[in-house]
Amino acid sequence: MEDKEILAEILTWKGTRWRHMQAVKGEGVDCVQFPVMVAKNLGWVSDDYKTIKYSRDWATHNDFSVLTRELETLLEAVPLSGDVISCTDDLRFGDVLALKMERCVGHLGMYIGNKQIVHVHIRRGVIIEPISLYAKQLHSAWRFKR
């Protein structure tokens, strides 16, 4: 699959509002459901796959990441070298970036090349931002088994 096809699917979610545990394009999605739904639409994940249930604030109160466990079931870890800017050489379109927001990994986004991440902002919905904004939070990268 070409990068432009991956990017096209990711961008169809742009502007969708944040809604906890929702996965409806144009209506509501959260940072966990977003990459899963993109992967389903691209044929990388089975249509019947369901994510685990999770509370909104679990990352604030735990030292382990529910998200990391979920990522390990669907994706392969991508070794990253160097800082957040130089590590983009290791990434491919559609890779999932795990960000440590509190005590553990608590937010996900998708890499779209050009040192940019698409993620679901709680107030602004699905947006594109420079990956450099998350230099301190970048914890790991993951790739769907395609």
Q: PLM features: what roles do these ranges have?
A:
Residues S132-R146:
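Glycine- and charge-enriched low-complexity intrinsically disordered segments
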Residues D83-I85, C104-V105, I127-I128:
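A generic local structural motif
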Residues F93, G113, Q137:
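Residues that flank catalytic or metal-binding motifs in active/ligand-binding sites
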Residues M1-S81, F93, K100-E102, H107, ...:
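N-terminal capping segments
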